[in-house]
């Protein structure tokens, strides 16, 4: 039996168990259609050892990507460097506003999408693969400039249908285990799943260094992992489905401060 299958079966059986138990530290939402009452970052669900790793910039491996991103930001490629248009201060607060509806492209884009727009439109370079190291360098460096700042995505106007699509995705059961995101992250957070605390599934730590990956990765990669865990068909990185879900998750986080590069298990 493969690792993903074993993990998925463990998840299903554990969820049946936690729903049969009295609530622990979690308070199940009275209205599952609304965001949780008190959003908590994944930071609150870490072991003491992992928490210490995140808090120490010298021990947090994610800062290796941030440092590489600082160099990539200054590097002349194509028609010039990112720094030719943006000094480092100009990046402060930028990551808090994504995903957002882009008027020129007439679609929703996240920070990685904005990086690729700059590459193709300004630097005359091909778009980066969304999980490529250079993309992770740049996205982690830019997001780090907004560390500690609250998210502030727009959900009005043309972004509104995207939010609804993301919400629908969050509540939709999927996969052979027939589970929805909200069953773990709204209804069961704070309960134990095979020795680990179930978190609220908040996105504010990404790009994040995951111990399971032994590397830094994007939120969309984490979404793929979740869907694999319930034996569902995964969406493509950067797909409309994941962009909509990302918008919903950021809105659901209710202005949690950004932590990237976070460390997660």
What are the functions of these language-model segments?
Residues 2-9, 13-65, 99-164, 187-190, ...:
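Post-cleavage N-terminal segment of exported redox proteins
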Residues 69, 73-77, 171-175:
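Short, flexible, mixed-charge glycine/proline-rich loop motifs
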Residues 77-89, 138, 166, 176-189, ...:
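The canonical Cys-X-X-Cys-His
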Residues 82-98, 156-157:
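Acidic helix-start/capping segments at beta-turn-to-alpha-helix junctions
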Residues 92-100, 193-199:
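Short cysteine/histidine-rich zinc-coordinating motifs and their immediately flanking basic loops
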Residues 182-209, 216:
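An amphipathic alpha-helical core segment
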Residues 237:
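Cys-dependent condensing catalytic cores that perform Claisen condensation/acyl-transfer
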